Amino acid sequence: MDAAEPGLPPGPEGRKRYSDIFRSLDNLEISLGNVTLEMLAGDPLLSEDPEPDKTPTATVTNEASCWSGPSPEGPVPLTGEELDLRLIRTKGGVDAALEYAKTWSRYAKELLAWTEKRASYELEFAKSTMKIAEAGKVSIQQQSHMPLQYIYTLFLEHDLSLGTLAMETVAQQKRDYYQPLAAKRTEIEKWRKEFKEQWMKEQKRMNEAVQALRRAQLQYVQRSEDLRARSQGSPEDSAPQASPGPSKQQERRRRSREEAQAKAQEAEALYQACVREANARQQDLEIAKQRIVSHVRKLVFQGDEVLRRVTLSLFGLRGAQAERGPRAFAALAECCAPFEPGQRYQEFVRALRPEAPPPPPPAFSFQEFLPSLNSSPLDIRKKLSGPLPPRLDENSAEPGPWEDPGTGWRWQGTPGPTPGSDVDSVGGGSESRSLDSPTSSPGAGTRQLVKASSTGTESSDDFEERDPDLGDGLENGLGSPFGKWTLSSAAQTHQLRRLRGPAKCRECEAFMVSGTECEECFLTCHKRCLETLLILCGHRRLPARTPLFGVDFLQLPRDFPEEVPFVVTKCTAEIEHRALDVQGIYRVSGSRVRVERLCQAFENGRALVELSGNSPHDVSSVLKRFLQELTEPVIPFHLYDAFISLAKTLHADPGDDPGTPSPSPEVIRSLKTLLVQLPDSNYNTLRHLVAHLFRVAARFMENKMSANNLGIVFGPTLLRPPDGPRAASAIPVTCLLDSGHQAQLVEFLIVHYEQIFGMDELPQATEPPPQDSSPAPGPLTTSSQPPPPHLDPDSQPPVLASDPGPDPQHHSTLEQHPTATPTEIPTPQSDQREDVAEDTKDGGGEVSSQGPEDSLLGTQSRGHFSRQPVKYPRGGVRPVTHQLSSLALVASKLCEETPITSVPRGSLRGRGPSPAAASPEGSPLRRTPLPKHFEITQETARLLSKLDSEAVPRATCCPDVQPEEAEDHL
């Protein structure tokens, strides 16, 4: 566009005018109000604008003159019609106007977001300031005769008033600034979208009309050319024909010309219609352009007007809020200037009432030691270890009386704390409270403050460390200092005192500031949680919480690697103690809340959890949940296929039918071979669980839980398919069939427990085996029972509450033989050893290969039952355990037998399946406590056979050789 365009003056003056118009238009776009030229020229608020001039050719002088209003040399601002005309004549002017409206809307949105966020921060700051001002005002007013107290009270009141003013300003700003500007922005955005849609529709119609016009013009030209070509004809056609009548060819040409002429006329009419349509669309587009540009200009001016109005309102509100601060601080400074240091302290001293000076404290004197004739050294030490005299109180008018009648210092105290005591106000330690301030201890009457050590019933700390709301331990009938609270059986085992610092409750896992803790195990607990506490006192520091559920089986805490997890032993012992006759045990689920509480107690207290007060179904649910949430089951994943393959070979074997034939030795041998491959802890745990389920199934008539039912419950728990891609791609029918095989395998383990694992963990027999009145000890014993426990009293394991008592016949035998040695007392084990020894003698020194119950290792009697963690050796042949009375004879006989492969005593399982371990005649894979015995290997037997010939009669004639003599002999 040049200066010769219509509507602009020609020549250099026109070009200068054109530049001035552009500069004025840019100035108008960034202005803040829609006012007349006079208001824009005389408004002092808009005299300067921080935005620079956008004209690249403008100088610094021109930029300064642009924002100072119109000047005689500067450009004249354009009117609204001139702005619209300028945009209409500019290419893309409508799109530019709509884009400016969009930018204005985005700009207003950013302003609204900034002001809203700033207002929220100011509101939060005002609330926090008012909160701390209220608290500080209350604290300051509680003191008396403090310097500048009135000034700081006014300061805090000023903060409160400023906070209130800030909240009012934020509310007023939302009404006067945010809401009008947001409403105008929404209106502008709505109309902008509407105008943009109209403009796009008009442009689309115009484009369609232009395209139709071009197609009609092309068609008109083509048909006109066709008509012209057909109308001209050839020279032969113009010559007269010889024949008088028209020919057929001439007739066809005539019809073709007429048809071409008709098409040309039709194309001409269509072309003229398209021209008229295009002209109409062009006029509509111009009208729409003028209308849209005009409306956009009005919307922008209205938005600027609203923005200007709300901005002035915002500045007014902020100015009014900011003016109160300097004036108030200036007034506070004027009030603080005349203050003199020490003025309030003088008023405080004058307010005190002088009193008579207190009497001087009594002087201490040396008391010579005078021993008594009837007193023992222990009494003298007790006298010398008496408590120190109480500290004198500065506020008391007379000191507390004390005397020394010869038994140590004594004092008479008064109940309740002394008013104004420094110990009570400052909160001294337990040592100073117990020794220096006798009046701070609860209770009444005379009391000796003796610092005694902890004895399990009273704390070694001061009485004030106890909670005063819980009463005195001496006044409680139960002997507990918590008579006011209901304590569980587990809570009664703790020595509780007041909590000294913030900690976490071991019962509810909640953070607490005030509560109780145990003096011995340092267990922390809420007072309200003492009623439901399940963790017993272990008389040593309680370990940190350990996750037990959902972890790897080998990562569980144990005393030694082969130990059965304490969760399993604890739950099974409790169920066997009082729940073997409960109907539906392991089938009926417990309460979810109580089960969660028990699981949490196990993780917090480990084996110190008290289960006697819980429902048997809750305990069984905890055991099932523990086994189900293991990352790898008791039977590892890599042995799953082998066990399932073995289970598929088993036939349905109803365990309740007494006439059911025993399984084939091959099945037992294969199962033992698989069990040998289990890790030590897994094997012990599986054996313990199967033994427990055997006892549960034995009470089928009472609890209605047969071996089949228990197999259904524990099959998918003990034997789970492996996780991973293989499990994801498994066929559902196969998984369903495997569940049946899992239950069948567990049922088979329960029914045939005696043949698979042995008799070590079976319950006591109802009728003990008969005993002979005077049995004679045989020369050789194959029992793996340990020696009598009285030989080493320190090695006896503690007897659990759920363990069965000793054999009554055994006690009667002990009474009948009060002077007999342990080897002479007839017991069921000695009878069994006699039978095995006789069989050995009859066989010429060869051990008979019979069933598992008659093998060389033998089996435990039904009277033997123990839940102590033991090591069960597997695989190989054990060393022969013999009597001391026939040591030489056994050695001479063993020299003639086949070599015996010895297994180390510390080995829990063989390195691989051996023939002796795989055969049913070999070891039954029992894991029993190893007794103190002598191991006869091939080399030892060879050496013993070379002893002097006199050693054989001496060993034969002396069946009652003591163990010490035998050891010396060896």
From Swiss-Prot:
UniProt keyword annotations, A-Z: Coiled coil, GTPase activation, Metal-binding, Phosphoprotein, Zinc, Zinc-finger
Cellular component GO terms, alphabetical: cytosol; nucleoplasm; plasma membrane
Domain Rho-GAP: 554-757
Comp. bias (Polar residues): 56-65, 231-246, 815-830, 847-863
PTM-bearing positions, type Phosphothreonine: T660
Pfam families membership: GMIP-like_FCH (PF22699), RhoGAP (PF00620)
Domain F-BAR: 81-344
Residues with the Phosphoserine modification: S19, S71, S231, S234, S243, S437, S441, S885, S907, S914, S919, S923
Residues forming coiled coils: none
ZnF region ranges: Phorbol-ester/DAG-type: 493-537
Subunit structure of this chain's protein: Interacts with GEM through its N-terminal.
Protein name per the record: GEM-interacting protein
